[in-house]
Structure formats: C-alpha cells, structure tokens
C-alpha cells in the first residue's frame, strides 16, 4: 500500500514488551509511553496476519527487550508460518547466547544487537549493567548459528563519541556484517538526554573518506559506506531530517494495542485494543483490523517535511 505522500508501507515493527534488563539513559522506547501492557501471542499474530493483506512482508521485533518474552520463539515461528519473507529482531544481546540457536530454528532471519560501547566501563555507564562480555558472547553465537546479516547498533552521544572508531575496529574483528551509527533523538528517554546529542557530520565525513563505496538505502534513504574490510557502516540521522521521513516504510504495533504511524507522533495512532479483546469472531476481528490499517495508512504522514 502507498500512503498519500507516495511512501510504500512494507515493514511492521512490533514492540513485544516495555520491560528491559538494561537502563540505557537515551532509550527511545519505540516512541511509546505508559503502562507495560503486553499483547498476547495470539493478538500479535492476528495483527500480523491482517498486515500481510497490505503487502507488508517484513517484521521487526523490538522492546523493551524482546528476549524477555517467554513466548518469543513461538511468536517468531508463527510469523514465519504466516509467510513473512523477513523476520528480524533488535536485542541488547544479554540473553542471546542461550537463545540464538532456538531463534534460528524458529525462523528468525537476522538480528540487530545494540552495543553502545567498546569497553566495560563505558558500557556500564550507558546501560547500568556490567554485561559487556556477555553481550559479545551473544553476538558471536548469533554469527555462529547464521542469524545473518548480524548488525550492531551504536547510538552516538557525548559519552561514547570517542569510541566510535574503535567500535568499527571491534566490529570488523568480530566478523559482523554491518553496523548502524545512530543519532540520538528526542524520543522516549531521549527527550531528557538530548543534551548528550552529538552531531554525526564529522564522523560520517571521515567514514566516507576511508570507504571504497557509497550506497543509498531505500529505507529512510540512509547512506551506507562499504569499508575495505567489507564491513558496511550505515549512518542513521532521523532528527529534523525530511529525507529520512520521506523514505519511511514502517508502521508500528505498540505493546498496548495501537497502530502507531510515526515514531515521533502520539496523535497519529489507531487504538485496536478493543478489537483484539472484544468478543468477536476471528473473521470479524480481521475485517475490523483491516479497516484500522486502512485508516492508519490514510493518516500516515512524515513528521519532518520539506519546507517549500
């Protein structure tokens, strides 16, 4: 489906829980606030089933920390049984070592691991947990079982800026496929932490100089740089960036049963919780959810627009 701004809707991003075993000071919480209501596996899979009718073929599981859901493996398996071409997950990696193989067997295609530091000291300052070594083990396990491409997310801020290039070196040594250098943006806890925002221009200019190839990704029109080692460095700058918004192809399912059309917006949402929890037949629920998706697509718009 194409929205009124000419943007295709291709990706469903599902927040499985707000609970997390880390305390990152800048967490955007998928732009969600409020109670930690958790949709059931059946609710999630029903929404995903309806989303398939709108040519959505990719699902990203997020949190909070999705590995804290005991039914995570079953959710992944259910999504693949629905026929999704690409099912991926973003995780902090703390529990990944023990789950990687099970997730691969269930059908998880690839994984993003958040790693915002390259030293135990900085890692603990950012996450509140002394778990750097355990996360590294989780990353290695993901590579070993074939959850590829394995991508590492690094939110650049004033506390870790000096570690960016060592992070690139670590990523190359680990053998991951790709890293994302992400701008800190004022969403969720990031609103309070935005004073730690750091401009990525100098970093990106240097990466472009040492790269052997530059690409522009369709999603968000993100710049990607291929290094001589083969590592791909993707630079993600969402804040006040109309180019980023013009390439957005996502819709979000929140933990409390809302279709969220934009990470930055709390007004452009469609509440579907009453449909999911109502005493309707599954056929009626599917019809009502389909209408909800149509409305969501109709109201979907870029948060940052070009000024004419």
Swiss-Prot record:
Gene3D superfamilies: Aldolase class I. Its cofactor is [4Fe-4S] cluster. InterPro entries: Aldolase_TIM, Elp3/MiaA/NifB-like_rSAM, MoaA_arc, MoaA_twitch, MoCo_biosynth_MoaA/MoaC, rSAM. GTP binds at residues 13, 60, 90, 151, 250-252. S-adenosyl-L-methionine binds at residues 64, 114. Pathway: Cofactor biosynthesis; molybdopterin biosynthesis. Its EC number is 4.1.99.22. Residues 4-224 form the Radical SAM core domain. Binds 2 [4Fe-4S] clusters. Binds 1 [4Fe-4S] cluster coordinated with 3 cysteines and an exchangeable S-adenosyl-L-methionine and 1 [4Fe-4S] cluster coordinated with 3 cysteines and the GTP-derived substrate. [4Fe-4S] cluster 2 binds at residues 245, 248, 262. Keywords: 4Fe-4S, GTP-binding, Iron, Iron-sulfur, Lyase, Metal-binding, Molybdenum cofactor biosynthesis, Nucleotide-binding, S-adenosyl-L-methionine. It catalyses: GTP + AH2 + S-adenosyl-L-methionine = (8S)-3',8-cyclo-7,8-dihydroguanosine 5'-triphosphate + 5'-deoxyadenosine + L-methionine + A + H(+). GO terms for biological process: Mo-molybdopterin cofactor biosynthetic process. Catalyzes the cyclization of GTP to (8S)-3',8-cyclo-7,8-dihydroguanosine 5'-triphosphate. PANTHER family: MOLYBDENUM COFACTOR BIOSYNTHESIS PROTEIN 1 (PTHR22960:SF0), MOLYBDOPTERIN COFACTOR SYNTHESIS PROTEIN A (PTHR22960). NCBIfam families: moaA_archaeal (TIGR02668), PRK00164.2-1 (NF001199). This is Probable GTP 3',8-cyclase. The gene is moaA.
């Amino acid at each position: 489906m194409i929205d009124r701004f000419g943007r295709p809707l291709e990706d469903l991003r599902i927040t499985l829980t707000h609970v997390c075993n880390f305390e990152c000071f800048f967490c955007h919480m998928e732009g969600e606030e409020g109670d930690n209501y958790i949709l059931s596996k059946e609710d999630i899979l029903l929404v995903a089933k309806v989303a398939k009718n709108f040519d959505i073929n990719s699902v990203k599981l997020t949190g909070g920390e999705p590995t804290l859901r005991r039914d995570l493996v079953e959710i992944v398996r259910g999504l693949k049984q629905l026929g999704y071409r690409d099912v991926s997950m973003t995780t902090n990696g703390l529990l990944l070592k023990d789950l990687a193989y099970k997730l691969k067997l269930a059908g998880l295609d690839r994984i993003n691991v958040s790693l915002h530091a390259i030293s135990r000291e900085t890692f603990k300052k950012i996450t509140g947990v002394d778990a750097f070594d355990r996360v590294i083990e989780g990353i290695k396990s993901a590579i070993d079982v074939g959850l590829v491409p394995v991508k590492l997310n690094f939110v650049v801020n004033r506390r870790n800026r000096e570690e960016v290039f060592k992070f690139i070196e670590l990523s190359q040594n680990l053998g991951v496929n790709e890293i994302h250098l992400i701008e800190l943006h004022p969403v969720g806890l990031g609103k309070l932490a935005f004073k730690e925002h750091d401009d990525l221009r100098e970093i990106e200019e240097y990466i472009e100089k040492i790269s052997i190839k530059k690409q522009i990704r369709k999603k968000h029109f993100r710049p990607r740089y291929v290094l001589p080692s083969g590592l791909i460095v993707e630079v993600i700058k969402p804040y006040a960036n109309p180019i980023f918004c013009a390439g957005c192809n996502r819709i979000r399912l929140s933990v409390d049963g809302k279709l969220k059309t934009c990470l930055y917006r709390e007004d452009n949402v469609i509440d579907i919780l009453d449909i999911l929890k109502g005493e309707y037949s599954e056929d009626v629920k599917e019809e009502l959810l389909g209408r909800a998706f149509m409305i969501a697509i109709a109201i979907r718009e870029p948060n940052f627009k070009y000024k004419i």
